[in-house]
Amino acid sequence: MNYNHKEIEKKWQNYWEENKTFKTNDNLGQKKFYALDMFPYPSGAGLHVGHPEGYTATDIISRYKRMQGYNVLHPMGWDAFGLPAEQYALDTGNDPREFTQKNIQTFKRQIQELGFSYDWDREVNTTDPEYYKWTQWIFIQLYNKGLAYVDEVAVNWCPALGTVLSNEEVVDGVSERGGHPVYRKPMKQWVLKITEYADRLLEDLDELDWPESIKDMQRNWIGRSEGAKVTFKIEQSDQNIEVFTTRPDTIYGTSFLVLSPEHPLVNEITTSDKEQEVKLYQNEASKKSDLERTDLAKEKTGVFTGTFAINPLSGDKLPIWIADYVLSTYGTGAVMAVPGHDERDHEFATKFNLPIIEVIEGGEVQKYAYTGEGKHINSGELDGLENEAAISKAIELLESKGAGEKKVNYKLRDWLFSRQRYWGEPIPIIHWEDGSMTTVPEDELPLLLPETDEIKPSGTGESPLANIDAFVNVIDEKTGMKGRRETNTMPQWAGSCWYYLRYIDPHNEKMIADPEKLKHWLPVDLYIGGVEHAVLHLLYARFWHKVLYDLGVVPTKEPFQKLYNQGMILGEGNEKMSKSKGNVINPDDIVASHGADTLRLYEMFMGPLDAAIAWSEKGLDGSRRFLDRVWRLIITDENSINKKIVDSNNHSLDKVYNQTVKKVTEDFDTLSFNTAISQLMVFINECYKTNEVYKPYIEGFVKMLSPIAPHIGEELWDRLGHENTITYQPWPTFDESLLVDDEVEIVVQVNGKVRAKINIPKDLSKEEMQDLALSNDNVKMSIEGKEVKKVIAVPQKLVNIVAK
C-alpha cells in the first residue's frame, strides 16, 4: 500500500506550526549555523518550481545541522518594494500595498505547503514601516559619513517607466523590466559612494568561500586598473583635459584626444563653426546605450570640436574630437588616442584620416594596431625601453613636469540610488529654503510612505510623492523656516542590502539588532540563491555591511561566508520556463498530485545542485515510487510495522548501512544531494533483499531521509514508536570498522596464471593462506605431477605458486 501524502503532509505541517518546532532560541553559548535563502520578490504569479530548489537545499542543511546539535537560524521574508508592484498598480488601478500583501499570503501558503523549516516568528517584509525605519536609519549613517550625496549625473532615464534606472538595470539599451527604451539625460540624483570601498570590496573577496566565477564577476565589475592620470593643456585656454591611461608609455604616439559627448568641457571648447554639428552628435549619442556605444563591431563615428590640446611631453598639437565610443562613466570620460597601438583608436584614425605614429616596434602600424611587446621608438627619453620600464619612466617624466601622476582607476561607478517612483522607502532628507539640507531626526523615523490614489510618475523626473503637499511641505518649528521633503524614493536594492541582519533580532525597536546577537550569528554560514544576483545585490550588500562594520554596528567584515548558486530548472524540452511558452510548472499541482516530499526529493535528485536541468515527469514519478518503496518496507498493507524489522542484528546490512551513513554525511556537507539520495536508494534495495532488517538501521535511515522528505520522515519516526519530533534527534554515526567486509577475495596463481579466486577471512596469516590455496581443487589439478618450488602469499591479495 502506498502512503497518503495529502493526509500525512497536512498533519505534520500543523504539528510543526502548533509546536513552533523550528523556533530559533538565542542560546548564545551553543554552536550556531545561519542558513539563508535569497528572499523572494512576491510577484503576482506566485511560486514556480525553480524557487523550491534553492529553498530545499538550505532546508536540508538546516535540518541536518539541527540533528548535529547546532543552533540553526533559518528565516524567510519578503523583498516587497520595487517597480513590478508599482507597475501592476498603475496598469490595474490597485493599491500596491494590497497587491503586495495578497501576493505574500500566496507565497507563504505555498512555501508552508512544501514543509520548509523556517522560523516564521522572524519573518521580515521590506515594506513594513518597522523594517524600513532601519533602512532609513542606515541611509542617514551613510549621509553623515559623506557616503550619500546629490550630484548632477548623466542618468539612464526611462520615459515609459518614468524613472531613472541604475546601469545594472539597463540591458542592451532597454530597461531590464519591461524592455522599454532608455536614454542618457543629466539629472540631480542621490548617489552612494561605493567607490570609496572599491579596494576593500576587491581584496576581501579572497577570504570568501564563494564560486570563483562569481568572485571574478565582481572583480570585473569593480575593474581595478593601474596607470597614470595625464593632464593635457587646451590651446589658448586655461582649461585642462585629464585622461586616465594604463599605457602612459605610449604618450608620444598620441595623435588626437577624444572626449565623451557628455564631457563637461565639450560645450565650452567647441568653436562656433562646429557648434551645430557637435550638438547634433550629442543628441544622437544620448539615445544609445553604453553597450551600443562600445560595440567593437560598430563603425566609429565622431566630430571634431575645432580645438587643440598640447602633448605635455612632445609639445605636439592634438585635435580634440568627441566620439560615442568614449563613455563619461569610465575613467575621466576622455581618451588619449594612440592609433598605432590601440585597435579602436586605429579604426577611428583610419576613418577620419588622422596621423598614426609608431612608438613600439614590431608591427606595421599603418595597416593595423600593434598591441604586443617591444622596444620604444620615436619616444624621446623612452626610446629603447621595454613596456614596464617605459611606463615607470613616462610617469616619472610626467610628474617632473607637473603633467601627471601614478593613478589607480576603477570601472565601478558610484551607486545611483534615487528612484522617481512611489513604491519605495522615502529618503529621510529635508531641503530647506535657505539651500541647506538636513536628515530627518532619527527619533522621528520611520518617515512613512503616505497613502495615495495618485501614484502615476510625474514624468518630469520627480516622483509621485511630489504631488502630495501634506508630505512634501514642512516647517521648522524652532526657526519657522520652510522646507521640502525629498520626493525620490530608494531602489528595491535598499531593503535587500541588510535583511539578513534584521532576521537576527527582528522585533528590536531600539536598534537594528542586539550587538551580542549579531556577534553570535554573523557571518551567514550558507547563502543560496540565483546567479543573476552575482554582482548587484551581493556587491551592494557587501558595501553596506562594510560601512556598518566601520560604524561598529556589525562585528564582521563580510556578511556571507559561503555562497552557492543553484542551477536553473528548465522545461521538458530544455527551454527556459516562461508563461509565453506555456511550460511553467506550478508547485501547487505537484504537491497535490505527488506530494511535497516527492517534489523536494525530485528537485534534489535531478542532478548536481548548481546545474541547469530539464524537468521530467518520469523523473518525478520515479521519486514518488522510491518514497512508496520506503513506506512499504516499513509499513504493511494492514498499516502495521513490517515483521521483517527486528531488534536483533544478523549483520547482513552492517556494511551497506555504515557506508550509507558515511556517504550521506559527506554528501550533505558538500551539498551533493543527488548522490546522497542515490546511496539511500542503494540501502533500501539491500533491505528488500534480506529477510530481516535491524531496527536501529531503519531508524538511522529515516533520520537521513527526513531532511529531504520531512513529512514522511516524521510519520515513519512516529510509527516506529517515538513520541518526539525527529527534528532534534541526533544524526546517525558510522563504525569505520564495519565499512569493510570480514572476508576478502584473493587470487591464486600457478606459474603466473590465475587458477582460482577464493574468499578467505581477511586476518588469515601467510601460512594459512598458503595452506588454503594448496588445498583448492583447481590448484591441485594445476600442480599435479609437478614439484612446488616456491609459494608467495600477499595478505588479503594473492597467493602465487611456482611449480615445475
Swiss-Prot record:
Record GO terms (molecular function): aminoacyl-tRNA deacylase activity; ATP binding; leucine-tRNA ligase activity
Positions of ATP binding: 579
Listed PROSITE patterns: AA_TRNA_LIGASE_I
EC number: 6.1.1.4
Motif 'HIGH' region, residue range(s) on this chain: 40-51
Motif ('KMSKS' region): 576-580
GO biological process, any: leucyl-tRNA aminoacylation
Keyword Acyltransferase: no
UniProt xrefs under Gene3D superfamilies: 3.10.20.590, HUPs, Isoleucyl-tRNA Synthetase, Domain 1
Keyword Hydrolase: no
Location of the protein in the cell: Cytoplasm
SUPFAM superfamilies, A to Z: Anticodon-binding domain of a subclass of class I aminoacyl-tRNA synthetases, Nucleotidylyl transferase, ValRS/IleRS/LeuRS editing domain
Alphabetical keyword list: Aminoacyl-tRNA synthetase, ATP-binding, Cytoplasm, Ligase, Nucleotide-binding, Protein biosynthesis
Catalytic activity: tRNA(Leu) + L-leucine + ATP = L-leucyl-tRNA(Leu) + AMP + diphosphate
Top EC class of this enzyme: ligase
GO cellular component: cytosol
UniProt cross-references to NCBIfam families, sorted A to Z: leuS_bact
Family affiliation: Belongs to the class-I aminoacyl-tRNA synthetase family.
Record-given protein name: Leucine--tRNA ligase
